Design a protein with these regions (language model features):
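Short low-complexity, flexible loop/linker segments enriched in glycine and/or proline
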Residues: 83, 154-163
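N-terminal topogenic membrane-targeting module
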Residues: 25-83
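N-terminal signal-anchor transmembrane alpha helix of single-pass membrane proteins
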Residues: 1-34
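Basic, amphipathic alpha-helical patches used to engage nucleic acids or provide basic targeting signals
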Residues: 97, 104-158
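A short, structure-level motif marking secondary-structure boundaries and short turns
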Residues: 36-40, 116-119, 161-162
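Surface-exposed alpha-helical segments enriched in charged/polar residues
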Residues: 53-57, 134, 160
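Charged, low-complexity surface patches
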Residues: 44, 48, 102, 124-126
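Active-site metal-binding core of divalent-cation-utilizing nuclease and nuclease-like domains
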Residues: 68-110
Length: 163
């Protein structure tokens, strides 16, 4: 079967039209795609917010500042002599501590507080906690693991014992 020039022109026209339609579909999808697929979320979970209401007066009684959800990489650094600097940094860059107590004047980190719950009983979380505990120990910063609920007085005593 031999195609005439007219048949070839029609075939090329159909292919061109198909490519045009596919290009338009791609363009419309791209323009519709939200470049900012983000939404606001609460800074603290309900459990964390409840604990914060107990922690805040305990910290105020000791004249301490409370910071929340601080990345480990913001409160500790990889030793400059570490050969595998990036590997060590990558281990701390995406982990955070629930609450940090600091000196309000110097902002020196005095203590970390992890609010534990049932998720800390999972194998991956236990492994993560062991690593974080070791990193805090290496930096000489006390790290408390606490469970909610707790009274302000109980927490105040626990903080004073470990500072």
């Amino acid at each position: 079967m031999k195609l005439s020039n007219g048949d070839i022109s029609i075939l090329i026209g159909c292919l061109g039209a198909l490519l045009l339609v596919l290009g338009l579909i791609w363009l419309i999808r791209r323009l519709r795609k939200d470049p900012y697929p983000y939404e606001r979320r609460p800074l603290l979970t309900d459990n964390e917010a409840q604990f914060y209401e107990v922690l805040r007066p305990a910290a105020e009684a000791l004249d301490l500042q409370v910071l929340i959800k601080m990345r480990l990489a913001d409160i500790m650094a990889v030793k400059s002599t570490e050969k595998d600097y990036m590997a060590a940094f990558n281990r701390i860059k995406a982990k955070h501590t629930d609450f940090i107590l600091t000196d309000p004047e110097t902002m020196e980190v005095l203590m970390g507080i992890e609010l534990d719950d049932k998720s800390h009983e999972q194998d991956a979380r236990i492994e993560r906690d062991i690593f974080v505990d070791g990193a805090y120990r290496a930096c000489g910063i006390p790290l408390l693991h606490v469970w909610n609920p707790m009274t302000t007085e109980e927490l105040l005593d626990l903080i004073e014992e470990n500072l």
